[in-house]
């Protein structure tokens, strides 16, 4: 049986805004981001970027973050988000939402891992049989779908628990509430460097392009083009580069550089979702 730990249930979506918009301005468009870090860090990272893009593109954007991965998945499926920085539009059940990829972070090949603390006596995946393993949430590609796929294909049965986001899962592992965790390798690495966490990798996936910049088909083409241009040129603009550096410092990660991308760049992720034995839980 699955159970959730680490964050309280939230009755409403968490809205993290990029600042008060004047009443005369157009209604801001929702910028959806899959939550991987704490809500505070998510806001500290994205708010400066969206403020810059809004000013440069003339398109007001508002950060909209669901408290859990499955709720984000449901928002994507219902087409509630105008723009996405996510991979939940590649889930087979969400393909009909019609989001169109227009960019991605440069060098954004990432992997999933199953890890234990460095001093753990567990050395092999098979030793996890029957044990509790924490994951971010049931909609996490790198942190749940890939690790659970690896366990299921090896006929290793674990008792999954869910922390709500990547850092919540790391905290469960760090405090000894579970013996192992399935995680985004890059988020874990950044957290470990920031918090001095020593861990050991039991299994790692192949690299995947992880997150895409996408637009809902209801967004006018000229609006998408304006936002796309602002993002893709951001790193080459001194002011934009400074904003990216400040955002990166908040999460102790290298600054993002956005580059063009297309839907076919993520075909391997779509293939995974069409063949995995992992049940994709949707709301």
Language-model region placement:
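Positively charged n-region of N-terminal signal peptides that target proteins for export
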Residues: 1-4
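Bacterial N-terminal signal peptides
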Residues: 8-19
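Hydrophobic/proline-rich hinge and linker segments of small-molecule sensing/allosteric domains
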Residues: 101-124, 212-216
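Pocket-lining segment of extracytoplasmic ligand-binding domains
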Residues: 120-121, 131-229
């Amino acid at each position: 049986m699955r159970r959730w730990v680490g964050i309280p249930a939230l009755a409403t979506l968490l809205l993290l805004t990029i600042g008060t918009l004047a009443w005369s301005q157009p209604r801001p468009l929702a910028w959806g981001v899959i939550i991987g870090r704490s809500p505070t860090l998510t806001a500290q990272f994205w708010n400066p970027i969206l403020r810059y893009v809004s000013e440069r593109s003339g398109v007001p954007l508002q950060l909209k973050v669901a408290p859990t991965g499955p709720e984000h998945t449901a928002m994507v499926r219902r087409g509630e988000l105008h723009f996405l920085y996510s991979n939940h539009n590649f889930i087979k059940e969400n393909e009909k939402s019609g989001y169109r990829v227009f960019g991605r972070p440069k060098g954004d090949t990432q992997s999933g891992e199953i890890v234990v603390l460095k001093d753990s006596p567990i050395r092999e995946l098979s030793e996890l049989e029957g044990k509790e393993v924490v994951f971010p949430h049931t909609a996490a590609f790198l942190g749940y779908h890939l690790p659970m796929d690896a366990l299921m294909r090896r006929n290793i049965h674990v008792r999954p628990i869910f922390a709500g986001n990547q850092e919540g899962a790391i905290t469960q592992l760090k405090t000894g509430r579970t013996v192992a965790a399935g995680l985004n390798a890059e988020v874990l690495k950044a957290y470990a460097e920031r918090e001095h966490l020593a861990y050991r990798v039991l299994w790692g996936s192949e690299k995947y392009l992880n997150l895409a910049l996408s637009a809902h088909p209801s967004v006018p083409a000229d609006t998408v083009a304006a936002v796309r241009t602002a993002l893709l040129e951001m790193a080459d603009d001194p002011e934009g580069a400074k904003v990216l550096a400040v955002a990166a410092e908040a999460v102790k990660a290298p600054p993002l550089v956005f580059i063009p991308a297309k839907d076919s760049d993520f075909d391997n992720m779509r293939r995974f979702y069409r063949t995995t034995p992992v049940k994709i839980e949707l709301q």
